[in-house]
From Swiss-Prot:
UniProt-annotated binding residues for (2E)-4-hydroxy-3-methylbut-2-enyl diphosphate: H41, H74, H124, T165, S223, S224, N225, S267
Record gene name: ispH
Known EC number: 1.17.7.4
Family statement: Belongs to the IspH family.
Active site (UniProt): E126
Paired cysteines (S-S): none
Keywords: 4Fe-4S, Iron, Iron-sulfur, Isoprene biosynthesis, Metal-binding, Oxidoreductase
Free-text comment on the cofactor: Binds 1 [4Fe-4S] cluster per subunit.
Binding site for isopentenyl diphosphate: H41, H74, H124, S223, S224, N225, S267
Full protein name: 4-hydroxy-3-methylbut-2-enyl diphosphate reductase
Enzyme class at the top of the EC tree: oxidoreductase
Residue runs in coiled coils: none
Amino acid sequence: MRILLAEPRGFCAGVDRAIAIVLKALEKFGPPIYVRHEIVHNRWVVEHLRNQGAVFVHELDEIPDGAVAIYSAHGVSKAVQAEGERRPLHILDATCPLVDKVHREAERLDHDHYQVLLIGHAGHPEVEGTMGQLQQARMKLISHPDDVAQLRLSNPQKVAYITQTTLSVDETRAMVAQLKARFPTIKEPAKEDICYATQNRQNAVKALAQASDLILVLGAPNSSNSNRLREVAEQHGCRAFLIENAKDVEIQWLEGVETLGITAGASAPEILVEELLAHLHAEQHQVELLSVTKEYLAFPLPLELRE
């Protein structure tokens, strides 16, 4: 069997930074360090950090006064920020800088009196954080093409859209086309909000799909970008499965497969790829790299955690 490894795959710069913030905080302040929500959507990462002293909570009211508290890479609402400032907590913000860029964009649009539309998945932590940057009526969520037709805006001439950073590039493009058809003067982001890593990993999967009989995507079931990778593979004509680790692979999937493509979501560590290759006895197969681009971006840590 031929095995194709997508490049790029796995951790993006925002995930690298978020995990490093937790590790540096543990090193500097000692455990326990509290993290609001999963720092990134990956069970292996969460358990690895939990074993080192990180405590994951749903809300800030679960954190004792005086503790170190970290916001996850997905970002938080203004209300959560205000609660963190009100409480005697030592706050560290691991929000991805590209998510933070979308937050600032929403604020600027609101300041300029635009009705803001957010294209994203309802219930996702990033969407909840972005929606929470403005008062409720000032931002509307578009999760499905049908939502566009149902929009009722007080001033259709003064409308702008932003997007969740981890969406399918192709599906978002189609939804944007619908918005433009309904609101010809709609204001677009100065630069596309879907992050570089999401786009790069989807492009790599498109290339994998052309060359593979089956694609395995390593990632968590609640990871938006990992789910999109599986969907992109299927939309480009290739069978695909989202798996959390090598144990999820079912032997019948591999029957008749001559070329297997492997990739990993932006929150999936490379060790999971290595374990999958070992599980497949990769040394007995032809393993190749399928590269569509290289990534060199890195985000700095908060000042107090820099060495």
